[in-house]
């Protein structure tokens, strides 16, 4: 197997080095053995199976919690409609701007759909079904600030999911004194993407007791809380600047596009005009 093929293989596995005793016990797996981690769910192949799976989850939880379906932003319109029809309470659309610690560079840079058009397409898909406002829409991918969040809500999302932003607040990819990225994972800080190896230099994506010591959970929690609070305050500030008292009142009419491309993707007027490029 070539090194490239081996790398792809590893990205489809939960490596045995990460399956320590307490992980194995919680997941009912043998310790230290590589486990399949396929890109798709192996027990369903299409929308009918998805509906069955949603109902199984709903029964297992006695209907006490909403069931969400997370989709990679590709065929957004069709996929959102399928998820909603299958009975999802929440649809999460994860765009190509989302970060990941275990994916090939070609996939990161050249697959998927950006966040802005994915929100708009998902919104219109739910609206076509008469389910906009009934099925919740969560935007994910590239949400790094309160401004990003406010724009996503204005475009039609009910909420935003945060991933990499919170990890960075935890110290992900940061050149901390205890870590030597070059010698430990062979890359410089900021270019890590070695989550799947279990060798996280900052102690986040690892089960190695020595590496785990590099992350202070209490300090990390404080940094994440500060990050989320700052995002919330920034979104609230922008909302108030529009004369509104609730972020749920944000709407597309609150925005204009600064580029022709943004106008076409967001379906909002180009600044200084009433023209929505690509849709008029």
Write out the residue ranges for each language-model feature:
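Short, glycine/charged-enriched hinge/interface segments at domain edges or termini
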Residues: 11-14
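C-terminal extensions of enzymes
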Residues: 208-280
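Glycine-rich phosphate/ribose-binding loops and adjacent secondary-structure elements
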Residues: 36-212
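ATP-dependent carboxylate/acyl-activation modules
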Residues: 19-27
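Single conserved hydrophobic/aromatic residue that forms the stacking wall/gate
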Residues: 1-5, 9
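Short glycine/proline-rich turn/loop motifs
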Residues: 31-35
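Long alpha-helical scaffolds
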Residues: 4-5, 88, 157, 262
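Active-site-adjacent bridging/hinge elements
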Residues: 27-30, 97
